[in-house]
Amino acid sequence: MARVKTGVVRRRRHKKVLKLARGFFSARHKHFRKAKEQLERSLVYAYRDRRQKKRDFRRLWIVRINAACRLNDLSYSRFMNGLKKANIELDRKILADLAMNDAKAFAALAKQAKDALK
């Protein structure tokens, strides 16, 4: 049987890795070995940060809701408890958007939450 060299397969594999490594710094987008190592790390970072993003946004929404609650003389926890008792089911994303863009509507929600706590 004739010996088969890896020329075509290797070139295809290298091209695939180097294409994915576009935009990396210095040798990490030029040299196959460095690009491959960095690509593995970048995929790990991407996987990790897709999960981290959800936690980060939830924290941001809570900070925004808390700031708006303080303007309405409520703490975040009492506000959320009041909403739950008033059977108002709005998620934190919507509440944070209301807090940022519609202060009157948020104030009305805060008033309902206060009334439910009494």
Curated annotation (Swiss-Prot):
Similarity remark: Belongs to the bacterial ribosomal protein bL20 family.
GO annotation, biological process: ribosomal large subunit assembly; translation
Keywords carried by this UniProt record: Ribonucleoprotein, Ribosomal protein, RNA-binding, rRNA-binding
SUPFAM superfamilies to which the protein is assigned, alphabetical: Ribosomal protein L20
Record's protein name: Large ribosomal subunit protein bL20
Cellular component GO terms, alphabetical: ribonucleoprotein complex; ribosome
Pfam families documented for this protein: Ribosomal_L20 (PF00453)
Species annotation: Campylobacter curvus (strain 525.92)
Its biological purpose: Binds directly to 23S ribosomal RNA and is necessary for the in vitro assembly process of the 50S ribosomal subunit. It is not involved in the protein synthesizing functions of that subunit.
GO MF annotation list: rRNA binding; structural constituent of ribosome
